[in-house]
Swiss-Prot record:
It is found in: Cytoplasm. It holds the Pfam family Carboxyl_trans. It comes from Xanthobacter autotrophicus (strain ATCC BAA-1158 / Py2). This is Acetyl-coenzyme A carboxylase carboxyl transferase subunit beta. InterPro entries: AcCoA_carboxyl_beta, Acetyl_CoA_COase_Trfase_b_su, ClpP/crotonase-like_dom_sf, COA_CT_N. The keyword Transferase applies.
Amino acid sequence: MNWISNVVRPKIRDFLARREVPENLWVKCPETGQMVFHKDLEANLYVIPASGYHMRMDAVKRLKATFDDGAYEEVALPEVATDPLKFRDERRYIDRLKDARTKTGYQDAVKVATGMLTELPVTIAVQDFGFMGGSLGMAAGEAVVKGLQTAAEKGTPFIMFAASGGARMQEGILSLMQMPRTTAAIQELRETRKPYIVVLTNPTTGGVTASYAMLGDIQIAEPGALIGFAGPRVIEQTIREKLPDGFQRAEYLHEHGMLDMVVHRHQMRDTLGRLCRMLMKAPALPPKGRLPRPEAA
């Protein structure tokens, strides 16, 4: 009996433990409950095949999906004070930052990169909701400003993929100051007459919506994205009225003139490429599989 207890049972437990399915192998659709294999979801740009629901996409995957051949050069971002207010609520802010950096592998919520999009140089910034809800703090603000300045210096369009819960409360007024700073940087880009295109992803709210996320020359959103200042539940509790169906969703805002277009993620790259070439007055690329028309002799 001791032999069975001491040798056989541990071996059986070890064998079964090795065969356990990892927790992230299957992803559940928030709308329909459909289970999707994680590799199939990644191959489909994190769009649920049956429902079309757009899952969140991290910054690096977004950059790779947008630039030609997934190739880009990341822009070095300015360093900022880590925790100037020495903020603490239930936990120290510095500890929350460390956890977010360990979880995502990023220094903060915004990444900026340069590269080619449909053979045209562009500068792109991506806000990652996975890093403390994509909140806007000093580091994120500096990143957006640096991206806008890089676009102005290089003479490229600037594309902003926004995703945020708003200003980072742990940084107080220093966080709120990023709203006018980014707005001023947008104006500087406009003076160079280079386009600023915003892609609103789910969700984009709070101080980000009240600043750079709604100041694009062209405003695009992904299907079903929640876009607004305060959330719908907060508004309903304040005005004590039921909001219309789909209120603050991308389609509702498009119908009411707040957006220029709602674009499926599968068409996003081509749409952005066409817009950039049009606004930069670059010649249109020939359709895929078709050779350019030969010049007359």
